[in-house]
Amino acid sequence: MANEGHRPDRLTLWQRSTLRRMRKASRKREGEPLTSEDWSTYYRLMSSRSSRFWMGLLRSLPSSPRCGICGAPFAGFGSRLVKPLGYRPSRKNPTLCDTCIEASPPGGMTTEVGVLFADLRGFTRLSEQSDPEAVSALLRRFYACAERVLFPEAIIDKLIGDEVMALYLPMYGKLEDPATTMLEQSRELLARVGYGSAEGPFVEVGIGLDYGEAFVGNVGERSLYDFTAIGDVVNVASRLQGEAKGGEIVASGGLVERLMAPVGERVEVSLKGKAAPVLAYRVS
């Protein structure tokens, strides 16, 4: 359990070093509130060469699922190696590990972020008509496809029943062209599910994409952190996903304008909570 300051009781040497360097750079004592500038420093250090090397080692270990940030395995042989170091699923956010969720200070910063929502179509009907174990196996298969395609460029923020939410954060230094990466990975995810194959998809999936500014960081009290993004860009991506048919990607105009050339069919869609129609592109 973390103490009342901003430094948890148990961190890896790498994370202790990152926090120490961040506080030195921002001239902040332990326990002092952090500003957006401090968070910017923290993320820059988290994406340093040494940090990327360490995360590369974690990702090379076998077994899935993994932490959505650092890639530490949560199952199999790989998890037995890293669990003593604190790399186990966090009770606050089980898609992230204890060390990542505890290492980040409370609060966050406003920054650019890409948001992806992928949702299973007809899941309620499928749940009513199928055996619960079969439904669970289908969900695990879908989650595994999402993890293989989206990681490590994206942080898998949430697995919400029949839905995946992923964040693309340029501030982590992994993405040179986040809009292109988001579109390419969305297409690859649909291909992994089976669209375009002779057998067809094993489940119907629709995807919504948006890109813009949002508040990103640890939201909530220390006893119940949730590393996530909050803002209109999240709401729009979620609503666009609701507009997507099975096998279709609906991307916002804000994301498509960052691409080298427009893609798909230009449309205007009416979204809940929006006074005016929103420009979007349907990509099949």
Predicted regions and their residues:
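A broadly conserved sequence feature marking short terminus-proximal activation segments
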Residues: 2-68
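Catalytic-core segments of nucleotide cyclases and related cyclic-nucleotide turnover enzymes
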Residues: 206, 210, 216-241
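Short helix/loop segment flanking the catalytic signature motif in cyclic-nucleotide metabolism enzymes
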Residues: 131-137, 159-203, 209, 229-232, ...
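Flexible, glycine/charge-rich interdomain/linker segments that couple
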Residues: 7-8, 15-20, 228, 248-257
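Conserved, well-folded catalytic cores of nucleic-acid-processing
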Residues: 103, 189-192, 196, 222, ...
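Cytosolic regulatory/linker segments at or just downstream of nucleotide-handling modules
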Residues: 243-284
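Juxtacatalytic helix/coil linker segments
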Residues: 48-160
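Catalytic cores and conserved motifs of cyclic dinucleotide signaling enzymes
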Residues: 177, 225-228, 249, 261
